[in-house]
Swiss-Prot record:
Keywords: Aminotransferase, Pyridoxal phosphate, Transferase, Tyrosine catabolism. The gene is tatn-1. This is Tyrosine aminotransferase. It comes from Caenorhabditis elegans. The modification N6-(pyridoxal phosphate)lysine is found at K284. Belongs to the class-I pyridoxal-phosphate-dependent aminotransferase family.
Length: 464
C-alpha cells in the first residue's frame, strides 16, 4: 500500500497536461458554448413570413375602426355583413338542404376526389351554364373552395411577381389581398357611379396599362356598387380587352341576382375573341357562403390560356379539391332548385333597395346609388356635412345602432355600403334611423353639393 501511494504522487513528466489544466480548458469550452447565439436551451421568437405579413385585408382595419358600442336602448340592425345567411331572411333552398342530406347519408363522398373536382359536379356546371354562345366542357372547369379561392387560383396562375392586374375601384378588397403576398401589383381602375348605369372608365384604364399588365378583373354584378353593366358596355369592355390583348378574369359570383329592370349577361357569352376565366360559385345566389364551393371556367380562345389552365390544375392540388360532400350535392342543387327560389331572393333585395332609396332620397348632403344587382347599395355623403365616411359610420352605430361599412373599405372614401338582405321591416327602420341621424347631424353651413364622388379620384389614393 505504501508503494502504491508513493506512485500516485509521482511528479508529472515535462510537457504533460495536469488535471487542473484539463479542468480549466473544459471551463473555457463551456463558456464558449453557452455564449453561442444558437444555443438550444432557449426558444427564439420566430418572425412571421413576408408572405403572411403582406396578406392584409383592408376591410379588417376599417371594421376594427368601427368597433364602437351601439346605442344601449336601440335594437342593433346589421347592414354591414355581406353574408346572406345572417338574419335568416334568405335561407338556402329546401332542395339544397335535401341534396346535402343525401350526399352525407350516401357515404359516396366521404373520401378524396380529383383535385380539379368530381366529374359529375363539373358536368352539372356545364349543363347549367354552357350555351350555343358560350360552349365549354367539363375539362374546362376546375372546382374551388369558394369563389374567393377560384379568384386566388386565377390570379396566381396568370401573373408573376412584378407584373400587374387591373382591379376595380370601388371594388372587392380581396383582389388586392390575393395579389400582394406574391408581389403582384394591383392597379386600380375607376368605376363611375354617377350615371343611371354603373360603368368602367375605359379612357382612364387605357392610361394605366403597361407591358407588365396581364389581366383585367371585371366584377359584374358589382360589390360594393350594386351596379350591373349593360350589354353595350360589356361589349365595349371586350373590345377594349381585345385591342390591348388582355385576358379577363370575370368575377360573376352574383350572376343573375339582378333586379330593377337589369339583365345579366355572362361575359363569356358575348365574345369568342377574348380569353376569359370565369369565377363563380354557390355562395351568393344559393345563399350558402359557408359551404365553400366555387369554380373556374377557362374559356381558352386562340389557345391563349393553355399554359394558364395547366397552372390552375396544378394549383388545385394544393388543397386536393374542395369539400367532397358539397361536390356530391352540387348536381342536384344546380338542376333542381326551382326558379321561384331565385325570384323570391330578387324580390327581397329589390324591395329593400327601393325602401332605402325612397327614404334617403331627399336627405341633404347625400346621394343614393340605386342598385340593380348583387345585394349592396352605395350611398355618397358630403364630407363637410357629415365628416368622413368612417366617422359617419362610427357615429351611426353609437347613436342609432345601425351598422354599415365605410366606403374606405372598398377604396371609395365618401361613401358607405348598405347590405340589403335583412327583412323589410328592419330595412325600413334602419333607413329611417339613418335619415334622422342625418337631419340631426347635418352641418347647416356646409355645401351639400360636395358629395360628388370624392372616392373616385384614384390619383391620391392608396391601392387598398
Amino acid at each position: 500500500m505504501q508503494t502504491l501511494m508513493s506512485h500516485s504522487r509521482i511528479t508529472p513528466l515535462p510537457g504533460a497536461i495536469t488535471k487542473e489544466e484539463i479542468k480549466n480548458q473544459l471551463l473555457v469550452h463551456e463558456r464558449r458554448f453557452l455564449s453561442k447565439p444558437n444555443r438550444k436551451d432557449q426558444w427564439n421568437v420566430l418572425p412571421q413570413s413576408a408572405h403572411s405579413k403582406n396578406t392584409v385585408n383592408p376591410v379588417r382595419k376599417i371594421a376594427d375602426a368601427c368597433a364602437v358600442p351601439p346605442h344601449p336602448e336601440k335594437k342593433v340592425i346589421k347592414l354591414h355583413l355581406g353574408d346572406p345567411s345572417v338574419g335568416g331572411k334568405l335561407p338556402p333552398s329546401e332542395i339544397a338542404v335535401q341534396a346535402m342530406h343525401e350526399s352525407v347519408s350516401s357515404h359516396m363522398f366521404d373520401g378524396y376526389g380529383p383535385a380539379v373536382g368530381a366529374l359529375a359536379a363539373r358536368e352539372a356546371i356545364v349543363e347549367r351554364y354552357s350555351s350555343a354562345d358560350n360552349v365549354f366542357t367539363a375539362d374546362d372547369v376546375v372546382l374551388a373552395s369558394g369563389c374567393s379561392h377560384a379568384l386566388q387560383m386565377a390570379i396566381e396562375a396568370v401573373a408573376n411577381a412584378g407584373e400587374n392586374i387591373l382591379v376595380p375601384h370601388p371594388g372587392f378588397p380581396l383582389y388586392s389581398t390575393l395579389c400582394r403576398p406574391h408581389n403582384i401589383v394591383d392597379k386600380p381602375y375607376k368605376i363611375d357611379m354617377t350615371g343611371e348605369d354603373v360603368r368602367i372608365d375605359l379612357s382612364y384604364m387605357a392610361t394605366i396599362i403597361d407591358d407588365n399588365t396581364k389581366a383585367i378583373i371585371v366584377n359584374n354584378p358589382g360589390n360594393p356598387t350594386g351596379g350591373v353593366f349593360t350589354k353595350e358596355h360589356l361589349e365595349e369592355i371586350l373590345a377594349f380587352a381585345h385591342q390591348y390583348k388582355l385576358i379577363i378574369i370575370a368575377d360573376e359570383i352574383y350572376g343573375d341576382l339582378v333586379y330593377n329592370g337589369a339583365t345579366f349577361y355572362p361575359l363569356a357569352s358575348l365574345s369568342p375573341k377574348v380569353p376569359i376565366i370565369t369565377c363563380d360559385g354557390i355562395a351568393k345566389r344559393w345563399m350558402v357562403p359557408g359551404w365553400r364551393l366555387g369554380w373556374l371556367i377557362i374559356h381558352n380562345h386562340f389557345g391563349v390560356l393553355t399554359d394558364v389552365k395547366n397552372g390552375i390544375v396544378a394549383l388545385s392540388q394544393k388543397i386536393v379539391g374542395p369539400c367532397s360532400l358539397v361536390q356530391g350535392a352540387l348536381p342536384k342543387i344546380l338542376r333542381e332548385t326551382p326558379e321561384d327560389y331565385f325570384v323570391y331572393t330578387r324580390n327581397v333585395i329589390e324591395t329593400n333597395a327601393n325602401i332605402v332609396d325612397s327614404i334617403l332620397a331627399d336627405v341633404p348632403g347625400m346621394r343614393v346609388v340605386k342598385p340593380k344587382g348583387a345585394m349592396y347599395m352605395m350611398v355618397n355623403i358630403s364630407r363637410t356635412a357629415y365628416g368622413s365616411d368612417v366617422s359617419f359610420c362610427q357615429n351611426l352605430i353609437r347613436e342609432e345602432s345601425v351598422f354599415c361599412l365605410p366606403g374606405q373599405a372598398f377604396s371609395a372614401p365618401g361613401y358607405f355600403r348598405v347590405v340589403l338582405t335583412c327583412g323589410s321591416e328592419d330595412m325600413e327602420e334602419a333607413a329611417l334611423r339613418i335619415r334622422e341621424f342625418c337631419y340631426r347631424n347635418f352641418n347647416q353651413h356646409s355645401d351639400s353639393e360636395d358629395s360628388s364622388d370624392e372616392g373616385l379620384d384614384l390619383s391620391a389614393m392608396e391601392s387598398d
